[in-house]
Amino acid sequence: MEMKRVMMSSAERSKEKKRSISRRLGKYMKEQKGRIYIIRRCMVMLLCSHD
């Protein structure tokens, strides 16, 4: 595995780094989307509940 890392060109490393960043960003966005969905559902329940 170390040999593979040594043999990578700077362009390949840059590409891999961008992929890693986009993967983390995608995971973060998915998490936030889930939180917003839950908050929205709670708001609807609170606003629509009649006593």
Swiss-Prot record:
Stretch forming the signal peptide: none
Feature: compositional bias, Basic residues: 16-25
Positions of the UniProt region annotated as Required for DVL/RTFL small polypeptide activity: 20-51
One GO biological process term: negative regulation of cell population proliferation
Locations listed in the record: Cell membrane
Resulting phenotype, Y37N: Impaired developmental regulatory activity
Keyword Phosphoprotein: no
Membrane topology note: Single-pass membrane protein
Membrane-spanning intervals of the chain: 28-44
Stretches for region Disordered: 1-25
Tissue: Mostly expressed in leaves and, to a lower extent, in roots and stems.
A cellular component annotation (GO) from this entry: plasma membrane
Keywords for this protein: Cell membrane, Developmental protein, Membrane, Transmembrane, Transmembrane helix
Gene knockout outcome: No visible phenotype. Impaired developmental regulatory activity.
Family: Belongs to the DVL/RTFL small polypeptides family.
UniProt function note: Small polypeptide acting as a regulatory molecule which coordinates cellular responses required for differentiation, growth and development, including leaves shape, pedicule elongation, inflorescence organization and fruit maturation, probably by restricting polar cell proliferation in lateral organs and coordinating socket cell recruitment and differentiation at trichome sites.
Protein name: Small polypeptide DEVIL 1
UniProt organism field: Arabidopsis thaliana
Name of encoding gene: DVL1
